[in-house]
Swiss-Prot record:
It comes from the Archaea. GO terms for molecular function: rRNA binding; structural constituent of ribosome. GO terms for biological process: translation. Binds the lower part of the 30S subunit head. Belongs to the universal ribosomal protein uS3 family. Part of the 30S ribosomal subunit. Residues 24-93 form the KH type-2 domain. It comes from Pyrobaculum islandicum (strain DSM 4184 / JCM 9189 / GEO3). This is Small ribosomal subunit protein uS3. GO terms for cellular component: cytosolic small ribosomal subunit. Keywords: Ribonucleoprotein, Ribosomal protein, RNA-binding, rRNA-binding. SUPFAM superfamilies: Prokaryotic type KH domain (KH-domain type II), Ribosomal protein S3 C-terminal domain.
Amino acid sequence: MSAVQRRLPVYKKILEENKKKWMIKEFLEYKLSKYGYIDSEILKTPLGTRIVIYAERPSRIIGKKGVIVKEISNILVNKLGVENPQIDVIDVSKIEAPEMFPKVIAYRIANAMAKGVRFRRVMFVAVRQLMEAGAKGFEIVVSGKLSTERARFEKLTYGKLYKIGYDAKNRVRRAVVHVLLKPGIYGIEVRIAPASLQYSDEYKIKPPVKPETTSQQ
């Protein structure tokens, strides 16, 4: 951290950190989308910056003898100013519920549509998968020339899903994927509130604890 960054007010430090995280995520998606990149987590540690990459094909992201990961690490240091990046690549299929990643669902829909499967059928399959995975809430939107020459969209929603506010921005997961078919480009947007998510306005009131009574002989 530079001397200028150390002198920044707290709120500006937070803004700078969030901006850098956004830039890292954008770079990773741009660089690795063709290798099965799904999502990433960026964590500040005393030793530097830990970056966890979730992917469908981890070996392609790592590269032969780690060449691709080393290249990404060098760019993060030299171009984005990331301090000591430590990159871990995790196979998303080995996670307990990969359906909690919206990009996994969006890619499944896009791939099925590219194979000629009707969009409504694919959407309902995705709904069943998300419900079976225990999602708290979700929204699936497919837009494009669905049944006429004019572009329109079809939307399916379920459960509790905030679309504005802190929770919508920082806790609800969102992904957008595009697929090019003969009629034109289609957009697939997926928002998911994971099963583990606890909204800011949700709280549990613990029942009062009864005092223990002791009898004296």
